[in-house]
Amino acid sequence: MTHSLRVIFAGTPEFAAAALAAIHEAGFPVPLVLTQPDRPAGRGMKLQASAVKRYAFERGMAVAQPPSLRRAGKYPAEAVAALDLLHATPHDVMVVAAYGLLLPQEVLELPRHGCINIHASLLPRWRGAAPIHRAIEAGDAETGVTLMQMDAGLDTGAMLHEARVAIAPDDTTATLHDKLAAAGARLIVDALVELERTGALAATPQPADGVTYAEKIGKHEAALDWRKPAAALARQVRAFDPFPGGAGTLDGATLKLWAADAVPGRDDAAPGTIVDIGPDGVVIACGEGALRVTQLQKPGGKRLPAREFLAGAPLAVGQRFAPADAA
């Protein structure tokens, strides 16, 4: 089936690529794709195209990669060229998903149906850069995807559609990301079909109550504070997979802790102390309960199940991970 609604798409990572693929496969014309410039990545730090760029190039879509869209910003010449291109490209709506660049008011007002953002949370909870991580870290039972009519604020626009997704006890950011990407892809196609059919989408202002912000994840957050309850640390480990991982310092070496669950602990063990080692994992005392770590990684090594890790890097009961503030 083909559609007449013309969609400019702006997005960068895999989450966005899933939406672009769904829009394209549904038959909506995509006259232009915006994505961030290629970035160095990997061990060789070679320039890598974004997931959105790779998908668009493989299908012959026009792609622009401006470093900014702000006329008065750091890259005024590039911004002007990109804005001229947007003005010259006939379109009806812009869909934005994890693009990573601020859209000035000029861009927000350009499409006749405005700009629709695909946000990976149930707004107004978890506005901001890391909604998937923060939902898991906080112990939320569910999250979802919200389609929002973009305005000048940070994820403050009116809500158009939402889809709810349960957070499973073993979900990591990686697994939940994939669920939400699929939900967002379905949701945006349904919304575009409705927009084309009716000419407008019903918009509901976000409530003033329940607003929370999902701050960007920093590498420093990887360090586990063993004084916290084990349940909170287990959520932290899941929230920070694949980035930045959980981390603990043992005898001066920083180990990455990739999978863990909370188990009963011992009252006589100081937080951070290894209290048990077995084929099922390494059990570490916490402020409340204990954390059983089932997947570890030593510096320069690979992520390994506990059994394989211990075969090459034995640990001992009584060893103690350094406090987070001393690591």
Curated annotation (Swiss-Prot):
UniProt GO MF annotations: methionyl-tRNA formyltransferase activity
SUPFAM superfamilies according to UniProt: FMT C-terminal domain-like (SSF50486), Formyltransferase (SSF53328)
Reactions listed under catalytic activity: L-methionyl-tRNA(fMet) + (6R)-10-formyltetrahydrofolate = N-formyl-L-methionyl-tRNA(fMet) + (6S)-5,6,7,8-tetrahydrofolate + H(+)
Keyword Transferase in record: yes
Enzyme class: transferase
UniProt KW keywords: Protein biosynthesis, Transferase
UniProt xrefs under InterPro entries: Fmt, Formyl_trans_C, Formyl_trans_C_sf, Formyl_transf_N, Formyl_transf_N_sf, Formyl_transferase-like_C_sf, GART_AS, Met-tRNA-FMT_C
Recorded superkingdom: Bacteria
Binding locations of (6S)-5,6,7,8-tetrahydrofolate: 121-124
EC number: 2.1.2.9
Cellular component, GO annotation: cytosol
Function as written in the Swiss-Prot or TrEMBL entry: Attaches a formyl group to the free amino group of methionyl-tRNA(fMet). The formyl group appears to play a dual role in the initiator identity of N-formylmethionyl-tRNA by promoting its recognition by IF2 and preventing the misappropriation of this tRNA by the elongation apparatus.
Family: Belongs to the Fmt family.
Name this polypeptide is given: Methionyl-tRNA formyltransferase
